[in-house]
Amino acid sequence: MTNQNGRKRLSAAELVTVLSYVRTRANLARQKGTIRAVVDESIILLLAQVGLRPHELCALRIGDLPGTHGEMALWIRDTTGGVARKVHISEDLAERLARFVRSYRNGAQQEDLLLESERGGPLGYMSLYNKVRRIGQEAAIGKLSPAALRRTYIQQLYHAEQDLRYVQEQAGYMSRRSIAEIVKICCDAAGDGANQPEQAGNKLAGIDPWQTSICEACGATITKGTGRRIESGQLLCDGCLRYFRRA
């Protein structure tokens, strides 16, 4: 399922294909004692089953996992280190993440990052994006991005819960315009804008969800006339554009 700028989200069949691909490769890597494919699997699961933004995934620490704090959720932190929200996850994913820590991050401290680059440093956005793009190509589904996996998570969560406010909380959307973005994603998935969900307190009169976009690197709102789409197809805010030009 794509638009002119690339894939917007995955169909159910495409999601199964991607998850099956990374799981098969990860299981083989575990047998061989290698880590790259296991990291790839963790990345795809955190994007597709938790809906993390790229910067949230890169900043995830071992102390944010259920095995550390005891809640069946991931703690997503803000820029000050405080817990911005708690995203519920399945027991299966919690166990997979715990096994990853036991097998590949043994001895790491709670404040250490969950996922590192292949050189042992912090995992950066472009490295994450390139990994996801490569996985999409190798799984033979074409263009794939962190944003497409996040949108897939949002629409699946809404279809499962039918609770717009809950989806807003889990996805980390705070503004009324962001609520409109969720509505757009969920209604696009249903293929019928006439069936726009109207939950109490979420009236969207006068809000055009197409007036703003979300930076696919940091999650910031991009207003009309700012940001741009880079060569890779990702939409970035002016702040991230300045950062990547310096890098």
Give residue ranges: language-model regions.
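Short Cys/His-rich "knuckle" micro-motifs
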Residues: 225-228, 247
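A short, amphipathic alpha-helical segment
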Residues: 184-187, 241-245
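Structured core of small recognition/catalytic domains
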Residues: 200-204, 242, 246-247
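Conserved catalytic core of the tyrosine transesterase superfamily
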Residues: 1-214
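Cys/His-rich metal-chelating microdomains
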Residues: 221-224, 243
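Short, cysteine/histidine-rich loop/knuckle motifs that typically chelate Zn2+
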Residues: 216-217, 239
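Cysteine-rich micro-motifs
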Residues: 230-244
